[in-house]
Regions:
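Conserved N-proximal alpha/beta basic substrate-recognition cap immediately N-terminal to
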Residues: 1-35, 42
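Short acidic-hydrophobic, aromatic-tinged amphipathic segments that line or gate anion-handling sites
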Residues: 32-36, 66-69
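Short amphipathic alpha-helix with an adjacent loop that forms part of the alpha/beta core around
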Residues: 41-47
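Conserved anion/nucleotide-ligand pocket segment
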Residues: 50-71
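Phosphate-binding site of ATP-dependent enzymes
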Residues: 69-71, 75-133, 137-158, 162, ...
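ATP-dependent carboxylate activation and anion-phosphoryl transfer catalytic cores
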Residues: 145-264
């Protein structure tokens, strides 16, 4: 037994994801595609000038991404990957830069019903000094936040791509200078990388009911040991709880009141 959305909803193309979001009135980052180097300067002008993100249409971990201040930087960046035969011109897109908070909204659905969700802010990335973009995939420091606007946008975003959500849907959001939220990506049918880690913390250290551990709940449903999950609501983890981790440093939970404990 699986809990997966329809295969037609699982798209690796970020531009394709934007279409139903825009149709539903959900803000997305302004984006341009280019077919040749001559179009790059025009794209910068149309998007209001730099800095702008140059990034791949698909992939994770900041794939082929760089924050470029002007069209010349963007041209050199794209040309580098084409010369190395690691990408083609149509692999790239140019996207609005949203400078404020970087948010992940994880949600679990069962036959169209939202069972649970939680929101976390990504604060630091591992070894970001070796990546030109400063993005290296999964965060080393993140914290739980509670934001009703994010909950509302996350639910609306998922329902815009799937009328009867089933399984896990991971939504990425970025914030602009005015505090407005933009959906940048939806991963249908998968967990964000640290979701199992938050589930482990929930069960072992927060002593919550095991169903707050979303991978555990997913597994039990798949095995038929849970038949009809009870909704837990949004914000299933306590606000302000941090997870800190790094290579060879273990994993810790932390609060700003000074509490900390090693979990792995």
């Amino acid at each position: 037994k699986t809990l997966l959305p329809s295969s037609k909803l699982i798209s690796t193309d970020k531009l394709e994801t934007q279409k139903p979001l825009e149709k539903s009135g959900i803000a997305v980052a302004k984006t341009k595609t280019v077919n040749n180097f001559e179009q790059i300067e025009n794209a910068f002008e149309e998007l209001g000038g730099g800095p702008l993100w140059i990034r791949a249409k698909s992939g994770a971990g900041g794939n082929l991404s760089l924050l470029c201040n002007n069209s010349s930087e963007a041209e050199y960046w794209i040309k580098l990957w084409i010369l190395r035969k690691k990408a083609n011109f149509n692999d790239f897109m140019i996207q609005q830069y949203l400078p404020k908070r970087n948010i992940a909204w994880d949600s679990f659905w069962y036959e169209g019903k939202l069972i649970s969700s939680f929101t976390r802010e990504r604060l630091e990335y591992p070894l970001k000094h070796i990546s030109p973009s400063g993005i290296t995939g999964t965060p080393t420091v993140s914290k739980i936040i509670v934001d009703e606007a994010v909950n509302s946008i996350g639910e609306k975003a998922v329902k815009s791509i799937d009328k009867k959500p089933h399984g896990n849907y991971a939504v990425d959001l970025k914030e602009n200078d005015n505090g407005d939220w933009y959906v940048t990506e939806i991963d249908s049918g998968k967990f964000h990388t640290t979701t199992p880690l938050w589930g482990y913390v929930s069960t072992k250290f927060l002593k919550q009911d095991p169903t707050h551990n979303l991978p555990y709940l997913y597994t039990k449903l798949g095995l038929g040991e849970i038949l009809d999950p009870e909704p837990l609501g949004s914000d299933i983890y306590p606000e302000g709880l941090h997870i800190l981790r790094h290579i060879d440093c273990g994993t810790w939970i932390y609060r700003e009141d000074g509490f900390k404990e090693q979990v792995i």
